[in-house]
Design a protein with these regions (language model features):
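Patatin-like phospholipase
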Residues: 1-263
Length: 263
C-alpha cells in the first residue's frame, strides 16, 4: 500500500479545490466510538455525535489498516494513544461522514445482494451450522447499518425536497439538503459465490467446514465470504463488480454528469 498510494496527492487535491475531503473510519477499542479520521477543506469542522466522532489528521496507511482490521482475524492498529479495528464495527451511520465532509451525492458500493428482501423465505430442513450463525451475525454488523442508513436518508430527502430555503429555515432545517444516491450492489450472493472457492482454503479450514456441515448447508457461506482472501475469489469479486457496474453504465454516467457513450 505504501508503494501504491501517494498520500501527498490528497493534500495537493485539497489545496487545488479538486477534493473536498477524504475520510477513513475505524472503531476505537477503548471506548467503542466509531471514529472518522479525515483530511478536508478548512471549512469542514470536526463533529461529534453519540458514539461517533471525527479526528482531523494526516492520513496514512495505518488508518487504512485499522479500518480493515477484522476482529480476531487481523491485529488492532495503534493510532496515537488508542487501538482501532474494522470501521464497520459500531458504525450506525455509515453515510454520515461523507455528508459531513460536504458530499451532495453518494455513490455507494454495496456488498449485499440486490433484490427483494421480502421474497418468500427458503424452507430450512436442518438446524443452522456454526458458520451459518456466525455469518448472520457478521451480516448484522457489516451489512444492516448501511441499508438502514440509506432508508433513513431517503426519508429525509422526501421531507426536504418539497421545501424551499425559507421554509427549511423556518422549520429549523436550514442545514438540511437533498442528497442524491446511486447504489451498485452485487447481482449474486457473495455467500454463495464464496462456496465455489472453498477448495482454495487451507486444508485445516476445509476440514473444519466439512465437520460443521457448512459446505453442504444452503446459506452457510456468509462467514466464509468474510474470511476468504484467496486470489481466485478476490479476482472473481473484482470481475463481478466490473460486470455489475457496466450493467448500470448509463446510470453511472448520468449520476456523474458524464456524456453518454457513443453508439
Amino acid at each position: 500500500l505504501n508503494d501504491i498510494i501517494e498520500f501527498k496527492r490528497v493534500d495537493n487535491a485539497i489545496a487545488k479545490g479538486e477534493l473536498e475531503g477524504l475520510g477513513i473510519t475505524a472503531m476505537n477499542y477503548t471506548n467503542g466510538h466509531s471514529t472518522t479520521f479525515y483530511q478536508a477543506q478548512d471549512h469542514v469542522k470536526p463533529w461529534a455525535r453519540a458514539h461517533r466522532r471525527s479526528v482531523p489528521c494526516q492520513l496514512t496507511v495505518d488508518h487504512l489498516m485499522a479500518s480493515s482490521a477484522l476482529p480476531t482475524l487481523f491485529p488492532s492498529v495503534r493510532l496515537d494513544t488508542h487501538f482501532f479495528g474494522d470501521g464497520a464495527l459500531r458504525q450506525s451511520r455509515p453515510l454520515s461522514p461523507a455528508i459531513r465532509l460536504g458530499a451532495e451525492r453518494l455513490f455507494i458500493i454495496g456488498v449485499s445482494e440486490s433484490g427483494d428482501d421480502f421474497e418468500e423465505d427458503p424452507q430450512s430442513e436442518v438446524a443452522p451450522t456454526i458458520p451459518q450463525v456466525l455469518g448472520q451475525m457478521l451480516n448484522a454488523v457489516f451489512l444492516d447499518s448501511i441499508q438502514t442508513d440509506l432508508e433513513s436518508l431517503q426519508r429525509i430527502n422526501a421531507l426536504v425536497e418539497p421545501l424551499n430555503a425559507k421554509q427549511l429555515q423556518k422549520a429549523g432545517l436550514a442545514n438540511m439538503r437533498v442528497i442524491d444516491t446511486l447504489v451498485i450492489s452485487p447481482s449474486r450472493s457473495l455467500s454463495e459465490l464464496a462456496r465455489e472457492y472453498i477448495s482454495e482454503l487451507p486444508r485445516s479450514m476445509r476440514w473444519f467446514l466439512q465437520k460443521t456441515g457448512s459446505i453442504k448447508t444452503t446459506g452457510s457461506g456468509g462467514a466464509l465470504s468474510y474470511i476468504l482472501f484467496e486470489p481466485g475469489y478476490c479476482q472473481r469479486l473484482m470481475q463481478l463488480g466490473y460486470e455489475d457496474t457496466m450493467a448500470q453504465a448509463e446510470d453511472v454516467r448520468t449520476f456523474f454528469n458524464l456524456a453518454p457513450l457513443s453508439a
